[in-house]
């Protein structure tokens, strides 16, 4: 039997081999390449390093480690940059409208560079929230052997014996406005909450998506909960590069890994860890990029059979670094696998199946920790990210429902058409228990860009109204949000969804038990309002925001731009 040699440069040879490619090789020689290098794989390193945000300020050392490992293993590293937006810094401003837009820009960057330069593989490094879905969407579009390296979580800050994180500051603003915290304490929390590089420390969007990537098999085990400053993160970046070289040898591609079954695994883990509502939007987009059939109703199907196992912020007690010490995502996955809630036959980037990767992980969590609960004593029997429907959201919307003392609420609508006026009303004590705040024209097209609502929700929590005031929006929520909040309402206001027709004082019901979001107004009144409603003029007519608003799909389909 003849054994065919492994071709490590199946794509890059299109621009490096043959006499006609002499001009191409001249360009490589200008960068220090030698003749022997043209038989090696050209491996992209999509480096998200940036001094815009602490989430990405610690990525260069990981990129350097990965580059060295690629070259040591016989590859050529080709470095290119990907942009980032700091959700935490842009929160509550017009800048937040660029956050979701950046997901698409990142995916476009990766697809463009990998395809345009005929790369044989790509290693993507990211930190802030949209880096993860944007990176994976680009990897799936290009569909060359690829691995994701998460930049790592931040370590907690400390003040007066309490662990702090970025959400602590948002909530402190509300406490201060309510007279429950001094200016001095607010300033100290501001200064101490974020002690160094890494992504926001709770089970917020970045850590949710990195954990989901580990469950998908597109990142290495244990890598999603490591802290950026720790040496094990460097080691993981180096190991990721070596694993990628093997994936190139075996022609193992992202679409081999990201399947309907592996997405179901990832969502089961998101439910078990109490992850961010943004996972719903992003996995709809990821499935679209992978060519996998996955709908908003699939999240509800997984939720109903998956318990919440981890006591993690924002609604729980612990941070991602605590989860790491308790056994990390592999421990959570092994428990779900043993309970028949994961597909053990899914392939991972290492070439091993999920079951093979987890074979040495204990079936039950250690007794000396409280972060991960045993299967027979979960935090909650069912997942926390519920898909609600009703006349306000016939396409669906997303709510965090676990841990609420009052999972059913009917109250008068308090209507706002921008986040800033809603926040001002909260801080001026104009919102009272029982109100249902409506923030609209903030969807994919209306925002545009579906901005997150952490500033208002953080202020509500800080004022002690987190569970007694409802908030619904066609925008999004930060992974740091908790309380009686419902986001991603679809159809959105700008598309003529019923949320556009709500008037001040209307009765609205949020019912987490019945999975219902309902405007309690007669059909005749709704029809009369619709007859005089007109779509608003676009807020942007040029540039990236105009392109996003014109092309974005509904939130129930992931707010993607290529849904043709």
Curated annotation (Swiss-Prot):
Query: A Gene Ontology biological process annotation?
Result: isoleucine biosynthetic process
Cofactor stoichiometry and binding remark: Binds 1 [2Fe-2S] cluster per subunit. This cluster acts as a Lewis acid cofactor.
* Family annotation (PROSITE patterns): ILVD_EDD_1, ILVD_EDD_2
Q: Does the keyword Iron apply?
A: yes
- The UniProt annotation places Mg(2+) binding at 87, 129-130, 452
Query: So where does [2Fe-2S] cluster get bound?
Result: 55, 128, 200
Kindly identify the residues recorded as the active site: 478
Catalysed reactions, as listed in the record: (2R)-2,3-dihydroxy-3-methylbutanoate = 3-methyl-2-oxobutanoate + H2O; (2R,3R)-2,3-dihydroxy-3-methylpentanoate = (S)-3-methyl-2-oxopentanoate + H2O
State the pathway, as annotated in the record: Amino-acid biosynthesis; L-isoleucine biosynthesis; L-isoleucine from 2-oxobutanoate: step 3/4; Amino-acid biosynthesis; L-valine biosynthesis; L-valine from pyruvate: step 3/4
Which coenzyme or cofactor does it need?
[2Fe-2S] cluster; Mg(2+)
**Where, per the database record, does this protein carry N6-carboxylysine?**
130
Top-level taxon of origin? Bacteria
Stored Gene3D superfamilies: IlvD/EDD C-terminal domain-like (3.50.30.80)
UniProt entry keywords in alphabetical sequence:
2Fe-2S, Amino-acid biosynthesis, Branched-chain amino acid biosynthesis, Iron, Iron-sulfur, Lyase, Magnesium, Metal-binding
Broad enzyme group: lyase
For molecular function, the Gene Ontology terms on record are: 2 iron, 2 sulfur cluster binding; dihydroxy-acid dehydratase activity; magnesium ion binding
Under which EC number(s) is this enzyme classified?
4.2.1.9
The protein's matches in Pfam families, at most eight in alphabetical order, are given as:
ILV_EDD_C, ILVD_EDD_N
Which purpose does this protein serve, as stated in its record? Functions in the biosynthesis of branched-chain amino acids. Catalyzes the dehydration of (2R,3R)-2,3-dihydroxy-3-methylpentanoate (2,3-dihydroxy-3-methylvalerate) into 2-oxo-3-methylpentanoate (2-oxo-3-methylvalerate) and of (2R)-2,3-dihydroxy-3-methylbutanoate (2,3-dihydroxyisovalerate) into 2-oxo-3-methylbutanoate (2-oxoisovalerate), the penultimate precursor to L-isoleucine and L-valine, respectively.
Q: How is the quaternary structure described?
A: Homodimer.
The family classification in the record reads:
Belongs to the IlvD/Edd family.
Q: What is the designated name of this protein?
A: Dihydroxy-acid dehydratase
Origin species: Albidiferax ferrireducens (strain ATCC BAA-621 / DSM 15236 / T118) (Rhodoferax ferrireducens)
């Amino acid at each position: 039997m003849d054994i065919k040699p492994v071709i490590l440069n199946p794509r890059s040879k299109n621009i490096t081999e043959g006499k006609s490619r002499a001009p191409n090789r001249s360009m490589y020689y200008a960068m220090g390449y030698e003749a022997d290098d043209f038989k090696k794989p050209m491996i992209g390193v999509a480096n998200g390093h940036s001094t815009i945000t602490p989430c990405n300020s610690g990525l260069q050392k990981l990129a350097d480690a990965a580059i060295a490992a690629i070259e040591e293993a016989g590859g050529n590293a080709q470095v290119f940059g990907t942009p980032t937006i700091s959700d935490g810094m842009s929160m509550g401003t017009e800048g937040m409208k660029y956050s979701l837009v950046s997901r698409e820009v990142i995916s476009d960057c990766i697809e463009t560079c990998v395809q345009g330069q005929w790369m044989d593989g790509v290693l993507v490094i990211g930190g802030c929230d949209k880096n993860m879905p944007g990176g994976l969407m680009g990897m799936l579009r290009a569909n060359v052997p690829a691995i994701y390296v998460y930049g790592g979580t931040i370590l907690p800050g400390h003040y007066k014996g309490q662990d702090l994180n970025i959400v602590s500051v948002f909530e402190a603003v509300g406490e201060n406005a309510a007279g429950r915290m001094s200016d001095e304490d607010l300033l100290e929390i501001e200064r101490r909450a974020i002690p160094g590089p890494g992504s926001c420390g709770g089970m917020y969007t970045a850590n949710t998506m990195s954990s989901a990537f580990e469950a998908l098999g597109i990142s290495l085990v244990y890598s999603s909960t490591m802290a950026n400053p720790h040496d094990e993160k460097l080691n993981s970046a180096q190991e990721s590069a070596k694993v990628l070289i093997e994936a190139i040898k075996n022609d193992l591609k992202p679409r081999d890994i990201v399947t309907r079954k592996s997405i179901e695994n990832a969502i089961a883990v998101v439910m078990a860890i109490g992850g961010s509502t943004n996972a719903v939007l992003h996995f709809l987009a990821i499935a679209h990029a992978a060519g996998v059939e996955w709908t908003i109703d699939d999240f509800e199907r997984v939720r109903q059979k998956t318990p919440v196992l981890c006591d993690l912020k924002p609604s729980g007690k612990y941070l991602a670094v605590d989860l790491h010490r308790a056994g990390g995502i592999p421990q959570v996955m092994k428990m779900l696998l043993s309970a028949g809630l994961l597909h053990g036959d899914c392939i991972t980037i290492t070439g091993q199946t999920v079951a093979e990767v987890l074979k040495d992980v204990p079936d039950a969590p250690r007794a000396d920790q409280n972060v991960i609960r045993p299967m027979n004593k979960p935090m909650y029997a069912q997942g926390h990210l519920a898909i609600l429907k009703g006349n306000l959201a016939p396409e669906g919307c997303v709510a965090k429902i676990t841990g609420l003392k009052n999972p059913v609420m009917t109250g008068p609508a308090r209507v706002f058409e921008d986040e800033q006026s809603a926040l001002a009303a909260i801080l001026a004590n104009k919102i009272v228990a029982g109100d249902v705040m409506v923030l609209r024209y903030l969807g994919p097209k209306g925002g545009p860009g579906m901005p997150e609502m952490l500033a208002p929700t953080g202020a509500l929590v800080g004022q002690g109204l987190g569970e007694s005031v409802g908030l619904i929006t066609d925008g999004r929520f930060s992974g740091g949000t908790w309380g009686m909040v419902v986001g991603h309402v679809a159809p959105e206001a700008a598309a003529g969804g019923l949320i556009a027709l709500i008037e001040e004082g209307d009765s609205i019901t949020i019912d987490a038990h019945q999975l219902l979001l309902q405007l309690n107004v007669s059909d005749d009144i709704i029809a009369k309002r619709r007859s005089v409603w007109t779509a608003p003029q676009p807020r942007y007519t040029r540039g990236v925001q105009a392109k996003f608003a014109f092309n974005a799909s509904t939130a129930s389909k992931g707010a993607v731009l290529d849904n043709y």
